[in-house]
Amino acid sequence: MKSKRTLCGLVAIVICIQAGAYRSVASTGSATGQVDTMKALVASGQTDTLKAAVFTGRSVKHFSDHQKFYLNKEDRNTHATALETLKLIPGILVKDDEATLLNGKGLTILLNGLPTTSASLSLLTPADIKSIDFYQNAPARYSFAGSGSMVNIITRRPGIGGSLMLNLKEAVTTPWGNNAVSYRQILKNTMIGIEYSGKPTKSGGYGIDEFLEYEAGSNLYTKVKEGLDTDFTRNRHNVSLDLVRMKDENSALKAQFTLGYEKKDWPVSQSALKTVTNLTTQESTTSEVTDHKDDWSEYLSPALDIYWNRRFSDRHELSVNFVATAYDTKSRKGFYEYAGATPLLSSTSLTDGRKYSGIIEAVYGWTLSEKHKLGFGARTTASLAEQNSGNGEVTVRSDINTDLGRLWCEYSGNAGGFSYSVGAAMEHFGYETKASGRHDNIYFRPLVQLNYTFNDHSSMYFNYSSNTSTPKIGWMGDASYYKDDKWLVRSNPELESYTTRDARVGYSYNNSWLYINPYFLIYHKDNQIIPIFSHTDGLLFERDENSGNMIAVMAALGGRIKPFRNIPLSLTVYAMYNDQRLTGGGADRSVKSLGGMAMLRYSGKKWTAEAMYNLPFKSISDIGISKGENYGYFEFARRIGKNLRIGAGMRYPFYHWKVSEETAPGSPVTMKNTSRMTSQKNTVILTCVYNFSYGKKVRAVSKKINNSDSDSGLF
């Protein structure tokens, strides 16, 4: 729906909402039976009163929109970091200190309701964790912001004193590492913290084997390419400074400054047998050429995040959040073809851009009664992007202004065994470019979450949501670059948003030794952005358009079992069937596949061991069908004292691990490629996790809101 009206500039009091029904739940406290009572402010603004209790056989509680996983003594003592505890949830894959979902949906990670990163979780000890909330569909304010699934980690109260933590991972067979360090000092009413994470990567032996065929002009171009070994490098660094001021349990002020930097260089070199066939005469010529593709980018991004929260009573609470983000980006894409030492084609696309954005959000929560909550929400964002794009000779300046306003409301409650949450949002998205002028769109987005609890061990749930995805700034510029000597890619300044609607029904069961969660998911993407091909001036042109229509069905079963009472051994499995169909763009395509993972873990008092195997499923990519890497790993670690853990492991990519992609029949382009990184075969990794803390426990407040603009403006 389009309108010239704009909701930009909304500055409103927003009502926070409980995404699940209010219920008293039994905390599993500590493994020794220690009593620990606290109020945990969860992601949606919901307040769960965790009553004092000792451990029971139950490790999972069921709510209308999420499941609450409790950690026992074994879980706290045998996992090195909070990030590793996410492996307890079937369907979440933790690899290289990054947490992702095996079903391909996005995963939002929160800490006490505050969006955080995998790197930050790698600097949090499991001893600090009280519980983990897992949302198959994110709560209202996050779902309306485009989040898929979500986890929210609830921690214990911090204390007066300080803490230092190191998390070091280094590969001894290749230049690769995930290293992080943090220090926090907590005074009576103030916490000061600094955190650094760095991920330097250099992978030798990288190459792509490729078959390519397409028409351009009156010729058919066919290339059989063999990848030549090159070095792929990617360096990521992030520093954050935190200041939290807590006047009392009902008031908090938080300010955070972050500085992120990334530099990536991903060249591809290939020796090719090139055949050009005249479609009129059917005459052909064959020659040997060398192709080189250049893909380089760099960005620097500072951000300031200020958050204020005030709880006026048990029934009313107000939160306000302001975020300012800037990006300074540079990128280079090039295609070069040589016959021996003679250049046949040289094309370079350079982009130099800056982006400035601001976010204002406020949340106000109102508890009507113990079983009923009502809320409203609002958020406004605005950004300005400047891009200079050129080929080294001609430079084009493109400015893109975007603004977004969102109003949402939600009502939640419970009756008998039923709990429910119903919400809706009205969203305005507007943008303006020099090439296409002003565009305004208004969207309506409903949200329904239902749950029926049969007993303390089992429940059934249903979720429905509708979300809008906006195109990235880099997609709407004026840049162009070559993928092959007759294949040119152009940006599209007239891209529009597209909508995803998904429905999920599932069942969950748990007892002292078993947890299973089968579910069925169907989603539909309307007006999806996909590549469209055309022929002009003897070239094949690729340009993104809002022409796709995708429908997908997924059926999955996740589970975790502890078969022996006296042996700390557990098996986590996840299996999924995926059926996707995409129409539009002149090349309909579909894919059906099976995928999943299995992880076996031994958790002793001092020693831990873990082995995992991942079988990826196929999915529809931009111009074809892709398959992820098939790999496995094993690792072991030993705990030394209370503060140190050292370990070693090996990751082994199996023969079919190579990431592959191919186009569907009928596509204007026939392509099949396989990528490989031989230097990462049999990667041996050493780990060291050290944490040290001092001080005493005090009361503190949980923080709930944070935002970030994750679109750097790059392609």
What residues fall within each predicted segment?
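Short, acidic, small-residue-rich periplasmic hinge/interaction motif at the N-terminus
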Residues: T28-G29, G33-D75, K95-D97, Q136
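N-terminal periplasmic accessory domains that precede
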Residues: L41, A52-V54, A82-T85, A119-S122, ...
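Extracytoplasmic beta-strand/coil segments of soluble accessory domains associated
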Residues: L83-P115
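Short acidic/polar hinge/loop motifs at secondary-structure boundaries
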Residues: L88, L114-P139, V181-Y183
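Outer-membrane beta-barrel translocator/receptor signature
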Residues: F144-V151, G159-I208, R234-H237
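Transmembrane beta-strands of outer-membrane beta-barrel pores
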Residues: L168-T174, L187, G198-K202, L259-D265, ...
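Face-selective signature of the C-terminal outer-membrane beta-barrel domain
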Residues: R236-E262, H292-G437, Y443-P446, T453-H457, ...
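Outer-membrane beta-barrel signature, preferentially recognizing the C-terminal barrel domain
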Residues: T468-N517, H524, F541-V553, T674-N682
